[in-house]
């Protein structure tokens, strides 16, 4: 699937001078559950990431990982050159990681960079392959890092018309299914394009946990994509995110919702450790709050308090 993946979020971003992305040399508590975050790149010098980044990985279509190849694993693998990291959406991965960790203090992150940069700082085209390989990496390393969820706050809206609009990307779907088989959900964003019949790929894949954005008034915003059959849950779609340089900016959209949903899912899992993937999903569905968009289309808002008491 040779389609460009665009960041599925709306955010107010100020271009600011960056600091060097020096990795924080701190020990990680590997007994904690880990979320694999698949995104653009990471400023590992952010203080809130200290002791929370279990591993960095780079998986690209191009030979533009920091080691000059299309795969790299280890310190520095997720790094974007500092002169580019606050441009062209490369700060998105830092934002998403900060939102995830800001909503659950008891998890670690493995960050997989899937977006390459050119010598001039442009984003390189992404095919399906790095996504498939990133999901495969998450599965193969699930025991080593205690992986309990995967998030990817990226998507595109290059869809087909009609009800059967979701691209048939069997390789991606099979990787998501394989993760489900070992109890690991893959959270993906519905998108923000004001489409009331279709959500973004790959969230439209039925085996994913597709997440739409909700306002702090418990409503589906007018700009949110909605598919009442394919959107699994809604979660808050706004948060003060950290961007490279350790500045705070407001982020809005279903990208935000994905990270919050994953953080809350793992909160449920921690408090109810005997529950399986299906058990948690059913509990979240049963205890959710019904919300609607301005046209009356409805969805299920995650209600963590109700789920914990359920």
Feature-to-residue mapping (PLM):
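Bacterial N-terminal signal peptides
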Residues: 9-17
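Structural recognition of the beta-strand scaffold that forms the well-ordered cores
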Residues: 34-38, 108-113, 146-153, 185-189, ...
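Active-site core segment of subtilase-fold serine proteases
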Residues: 23-108, 116-118, 130-133, 140-146, ...
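C-terminal subdomain of the subtilisin-like protease fold in secreted/lumenal serine endopeptidases
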Residues: 23, 145-154, 207-210, 222, ...
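Sec-dependent signal peptide recognition
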Residues: 2-9
């Amino acid at each position: 699937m040779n389609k460009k993946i665009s960041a599925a979020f709306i955010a107010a971003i100020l271009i600011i001078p960056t600091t060097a992305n020096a990795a924080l040399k701190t020990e990680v508590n590997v007994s904690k559950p880990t979320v694999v975050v698949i995104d653009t790149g990471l400023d590992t010098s952010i203080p809130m990431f200290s002791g929370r980044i279990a591993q960095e990985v780079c998986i690209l279509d191009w030979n533009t990982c920091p080691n000059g190849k299309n795969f790299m694993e280890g310190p520095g693998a997720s790094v974007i050159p500092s002169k580019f990291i606050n441009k062209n959406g490369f700060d998105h991965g830092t934002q998403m990681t900060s939102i995830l960790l800001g909503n659950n203090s008891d998890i670690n992150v493995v960050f997989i960079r899937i977006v390459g940069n050119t010598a001039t700082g442009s984003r390189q085209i992404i095919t399906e392959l790095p996504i498939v390989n990133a999901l495969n990496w998450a599965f193969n390393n699930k025991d080593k890092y205690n992986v309990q969820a995967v998030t990817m706050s990226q998507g595109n809206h290059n869809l087909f018309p009609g009800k059967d609009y979701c691209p048939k990307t069997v390789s991606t779907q099979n990787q998501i299914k394989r993760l489900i088989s070992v109890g690991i959900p893959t959270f993906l964003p519905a998108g923000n394009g004001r489409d009331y019949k279709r959500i973004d790929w790959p969230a439209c894949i039925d085996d994913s946990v597709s997440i739409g954005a909700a306002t702090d008034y418990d409503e589906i915003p007018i700009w949110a994509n909605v598919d009442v059959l394919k959107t699994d849950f809604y979660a808050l779609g706004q948060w003060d995110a950290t961007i490279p340089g350790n500045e705070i900016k407001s982020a809005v959209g279903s990208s935000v919702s994905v990270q919050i949903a994953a953080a809350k899912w793992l909160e449920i899992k921690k408090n109810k450790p005997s529950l399986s993937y299906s058990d948690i999903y059913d509990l979240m569905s049963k205890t959710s709050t019904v919300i609607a968009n301005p046209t009356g289309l409805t969805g299920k808002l995650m209600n963590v308090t109700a789920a914990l008491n359920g």
